[in-house]
Amino acid sequence: MAVIKCKPTSPGRRHLVKVVNSDLHKGKPFAGLLAKKSKSGGRNNTGRITVRHIGGGHKQHYRLIDFKRNKDGIPAKVERLEYDPNRTANIALVLYADGERRYILAAKGMQAGDKIQSGIDAEIKSGNAMPLRNIPVGSVVHAVEMKPGKGAQIARSAGAYVQVIARDGAYATLRLRSGEMRKVPVDCRATLGEVGNAEHMLRQLGKAGAKRWRGVRPTVRGVAMNPVDHPHGGGEGRTSGGRHPVSPWGQPTKGYKTRSNKRTDKYIVRRRNKK
């Protein structure tokens, strides 16, 4: 995988930094694992905008990813690595010995032809999935479940990983990239190794149009709006907003704690590191 800085032959290419992966499949995705993906434009079922700055973009198919990795005891072969427009990580098309194909997240170092497996009897190597009770303490894992059988929820983006730092009774303690330490049931599954495509963080889109291709619309500053549109709006000439930064709905927007899930507080051993 190479990081290429383009020559400034135009304003849009002056700041363009591309991540080129020659190992990715050049053809179409596997049709049996595609699903329809409708555009919402950031609107909910009543037509109101619930997420700002969304709209347009290239048409996409959703790839059905196997986040449960519950096909135990059946070896699989990685057929190819593919680009997925729905996530930062690349995905791998795997063929199981019984003939079934599934998409999984491509682990760091995974290549076409690799053999992988799931279950308690799987070898301790990158790409294999098993319950946390069978993973050695100190191992680096990704695609971790929070509830047994629910499917992976933690460490799924490009370059992400979690470290297993302890195991005590029914729970394993994980250290997340944010610095948070969290308890997870030992029956939850995880995949060994890191998520691939870690160079994704080095890319630069280079121009606003590249954001539009991805369905991201412009973000307008509150101080550039009218008072009816934003708490920072209005005033004669340029202003600083006149108050601490808030969202369009008046909620403090820099460093304000919004988490209120007391039900799962008991599983957090240490909160994430402060920036």
Curated annotation (Swiss-Prot):
Coiled coil: none annotated. GO terms for biological process: cytoplasmic translation. Keywords: Ribonucleoprotein, Ribosomal protein, RNA-binding, rRNA-binding. PROSITE patterns: RIBOSOMAL_L2. It holds the Pfam family Ribosomal_L2. The keyword Ribosomal protein applies. It comes from the Bacteria. One of its GO terms (cellular component) is large ribosomal subunit. One of its GO terms (molecular function) is rRNA binding. Residues 223-275 are annotated as: Disordered. One of the primary rRNA binding proteins. Required for association of the 30S and 50S subunits to form the 70S ribosome, for tRNA binding and peptide bond formation. It has been suggested to have peptidyltransferase activity; this is somewhat controversial. Makes several contacts with the 16S rRNA in the 70S ribosome. Belongs to the universal ribosomal protein uL2 family. Part of the 50S ribosomal subunit. Forms a bridge to the 30S subunit in the 70S ribosome. This is Large ribosomal subunit protein uL2. It comes from Shewanella halifaxensis (strain HAW-EB4). The lineage of its organism: Bacteria, Pseudomonadati, Pseudomonadota, Gammaproteobacteria, Alteromonadales.
